[in-house]
Each structure stands twice: as C-alpha cells, then as structure tokens.
Amino acid sequence: MTIRFYIHTIAKRAKAIALVDSGATENFMNLTYARWLRLPIHPLEQPRKIFNVNRTENKSSELKYYTDLKVQTGTTRSSLHFFLTNLGENKAILSYSWFMAT
C-alpha cells in the first residue's frame, strides 16, 4: 500500500509518496531524495546493519545516516525519525508502527 504525505521543512513543503510496509520496524527515506530536498542529514554514532525480508543480512548497504522531520498525512501531523539509505525508486517507507499510530 502507498500513501501520499507531505514533508515540512523550514524553507518548503514537499509532496511524496511512501510505501507502507507492515514488516518494516523503522521508517526509511531514500538518501538521494533527502539530499535533493536539502534535508538535515545526521550521521549515526554506529552504523546499523540492514536485514532482508528473509532475515539475511543485506551485504550491499548499511544504515549510516538519519533525519528527523515533520510530516503530514491528510490532517494528521507528526514528527518522524527516518533512517536514510538507497531505496531505489521509492522515496520513503513508513513502518507498521507508524501506520497503527495514525
């Protein structure tokens, strides 16, 4: 399932479409997209491993960066923590816990 959402920054409001993933334990955003939006990007103190759906380690990538953003879906606004990585064509993945909280 996908959902349309807005990212609020000091300078602008950007529209994006996110994939809602019932198996995701965290929120993710495409690092290239975050750089394109000129979002604040922060390094993680310790890089984190990424695991595939079958619970094997993803050897092509690890999490090194994050950003904290204000986002809006419909009339609901929230502050979310996104880990930044390569998501291919996807702009963002919203976790199951986010979905249940809205």
PLM regions with names:
Residues 1-6, 10-102:
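Aspartic protease
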